[in-house]
Amino acid sequence: MKLGIVGLPNVGKSTLFNAITQAGAESANYPFCTIDPNVGMVAVPDERLQPLTDLYHAKKTTPAVVEFVDIAGLVRGASKGEGLGNKFLSHIREVDAIVHVVRCFDNENIVHVEGSVDPARDIETINLELILADIEHLERRLERTRKAAKADKKLLVDVDILEKLKAHLEEGKTARTFEGFGEDEDVDRVIGESDLLSAKKVIYAANMDEEGFTGNDTENERLKAVQAIADAEGAMVLPICAKLEEDIAGMDADEKEMFLSELGLHESGLDRLIKVCYDLLGLMSYLTAGEQEVRAWTIAKGTKAPQAAGKIHTDFERGFIRAEVINYKDLIELGSLAAAREKGLVRSEGKEYVMQDGDVVLFRFNV
């Protein structure tokens, strides 16, 4: 899973990225300090891994990972190449979903490119640049499809959808709010094939003031403005304090727990962000366990056993025989796989088995 962190300059993008990856991406107080995207691999928090590691005395523990990309800031006119617009847009095209950092904090030492803090305006600015780029992209596809439809009448369905979609975008609306998207097979296919930037799923990371941050300040007017936009387009909002997260990132586990407790928080904003992104894309993890390694594997919800096996190695999918599956909680409660077998809790599942989150699996295959 690859997530792009986007936002206008000086909204806290690189500060958030620093906290996520502890990679120390430069976070200077001027536009375009992150000219090339910084990439960081981040573990998906999973409290099941350590108990499994202890149970098997595993030599290695490997969590599922999320790839975060810190993408250079953009300004008005990015779709026409202003600032670093062209680079920005091409980098967004490569990600699975967008974490849009929106400035909701005051700091007179950090200059906002528009001269004031207005999250609704900032969201509109970035969405508009994505929409304008999509319109240009769509016009070329529509022209090609119209020509092809003269010989293949089946493509008239695509032409109709593309024309309506173009009109929708020209009203300043994102592709993800287009009627039928996520519900109609033809609409989903056409939008998917069009590779539209404004169709990507979004989490608005509302970057709040450090002072008095609770992670759930529902009365904050700027947060309300972000929430209203998210509600209108079916997006998600996560209040976060990037500066606070950057401070926490340098702490050891005990310090971190104590610090969060003092703030009245159960987990860091980064852990919440990663989990929300995971859920947003409809992903889950299954687990493999043995003396050599305990590992979490990322798959889409609804994945069947052979395709899940293919995540480990293509041979596993090609030569799939069966999956030996046990529920994680049952395995931990009984204390060993042998005890679980005695209780009849290890199931033998075939090619049609739909994997469940937290399945502990041993795949049998032959090639």
Model-found features: residue ranges?
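Conserved G1/Walker A P-loop phosphate-binding module
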Residues: 1-111, 139-140, 144
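C-terminal-of-GTPase-core extension/linker across diverse P-loop GTPases
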Residues: 2-6, 17, 144-354, 361, ...
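A generic, residue-level signal for flexible/boundary positions that often mark functional hotspots
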Residues: 5, 21-29, 36-38, 43-46, ...
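Short capping/connector residues at structural and topological boundaries
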Residues: 6, 32, 37-40, 47-49, ...
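Short, intrinsically disordered, mixed-charge
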Residues: 22, 54, 90, 128, ...
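Amphipathic alpha-helical transducer elements in NTP-driven molecular machines
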Residues: 32, 46-49, 62-68, 82-96, ...
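Conserved Switch II/interswitch segment of TRAFAC-class P-loop GTPases
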Residues: 40-45, 72-82, 93-155, 168-184, ...
